[in-house]
Swiss-Prot record:
Reaction catalysis annotation: S-ubiquitinyl-[E2 ubiquitin-conjugating enzyme]-L-cysteine + [acceptor protein]-L-lysine = [E2 ubiquitin-conjugating enzyme]-L-cysteine + N(6)-ubiquitinyl-[acceptor protein]-L-lysine
F-box domain ranges (all copies): 16-65
Enzyme class label: transferase
Protein name, entry field: E3 ubiquitin-protein ligase SGIP1
Organism: Arabidopsis thaliana
Molecular function, one GO term: ubiquitin protein ligase activity
InterPro entries: F-box-assoc_dom_typ3, F-box-assoc_interact_dom, F-box-like_dom_sf, F-box_dom
């Protein structure tokens, strides 16, 4: 009699033979709960995983979650350069930073240089029109006539195309610009309304906060009705932190944020509640970053920064 042969199943070294592919919807949900660093590492697992960060459903979900937990963003001038209009850094829009002739995404580490040859080029500003990221605006002052015009372009397209927009109110661009619902302003965002926030001058330090400052809010844009409130503090800022403080902006909750401007020890962020007339200070420790920067380096502080993993290409 022939001996019966037993069928032997060898254990496989590959788990893929026993596992099904993870549904893309589940991958999007998993990736949305990870940090940007973990997302970058997960891209090395497989081609499917590497494609998730480029899916629009994922980038919009990640941005939505990130918007619910805004952060403070600090930027430093390279090698302690002297601040000027050539290296001015503008407030981020949907996670994108803009400076002279460049757009940068801190979350992905990408940098774009949209080419535009213009005489009298002023700067590149971030624009968030119709919930579309990666739009940039270049205000240009025509030196001959002092007229003002803008050119708008969208990053990530095969060919960079600039669209000319004439401004009905000729003016020179201001530094502290913001974008609210696709409209470019040069003031402050006060709970979704246009606001002006400035300190009451004290001596030669016209931008330094001492004992009081003024907040004006555009309550009715059609009738140009502005509210005006003067906040007089019951204490001196220098006694609170023993340093000069400058206005950074206003949070979505209505708190006014102030900070020092240079990399000195200690570095403070102060949150002022105008309703209760109270302030809370937080010391920021930069660790090894501070050791690599020149003493007294200029620091740009931005509030309500959100992480955006959308790619520029």
């Amino acid at each position: 009699m022939e001996k019966s042969q037993k069928q032997v199943t060898r254990p496989s070294n590959s788990r893929r033979e026993y596992s099904k592919e993870i549904p893309i919807d589940l991958l999007i949900e998993i990736f949305s709960r990870l940090s940007t660093g973990d997302i970058a590492r997960c891209r090395c697992v497989s081609k499917i995983w590497s494609s998730v960060p480029r899916l629009r459903d994922f980038t919009e979900l990640f941005l939505k979650i990130s918007s619910a937990r805004p952060r403070i963003l600090f930027t430093f001038l390279h090698n302690g350069m002297v601040p000027s209009y050539d290296n001015e850094i503008h407030a981020p829009v949907r996670g994108f930073l803009c400076s002279k002739a460049s757009v940068y995404n801190p979350s992905t580490g990408e940098c774009a240089y949209p080419y535009l040859e213009l005489l009298g080029l002023w700067d590149i500003l971030p624009v968030d029109a119709e919930n579309l990221a990666k739009k940039v605006c270049v205000p240009k002052v025509l030196l001959a006539s002092e007229d003002f015009a803008c050119r708008v372009s969208t990053l990530g397209t095969e060919e960079v195309c600039w669209r000319m927009i004439q401004c009905s109110l000729p003016h020179r661009p201001f530094r502290d610009e913001i974008c609210i619902d696709g409209v470019l302003y040069y003031l402050a965002n006060c709970k979704g309304k246009l606001g002006i926030l400035w300190p009451v001058p004290s001596g030669d330090q016209s931008h330094e906060v001492t004992r009081s400052f003024v907040l004006r809010i555009l309550e009715d844009a059609n009738k140009l009705i502005w509210s005006r409130t003067v906040y007089t503090l019951s204490f001196n800022w220098k006694k609170l932190v023993n340093k000069s403080l400058y206005i950074v902006g206003m949070t979505s909750g209505g708190e006014i944020v102030l900070s020092t401007r240079h990399l000195n020890y200690p570095f403070y962020i102060v949150y002022y509640n105008p309703v209760n007339n109270t302030a809370a200070k937080n010391e920021i420790q930069f660790g090894n970053i501070a050791n690599k920067k020149a003493e007294n380096s200029r620091i740009y502080t931005f509030i309500d920064h959100v992480e955006n993993v959308e790619h520029m290409d």
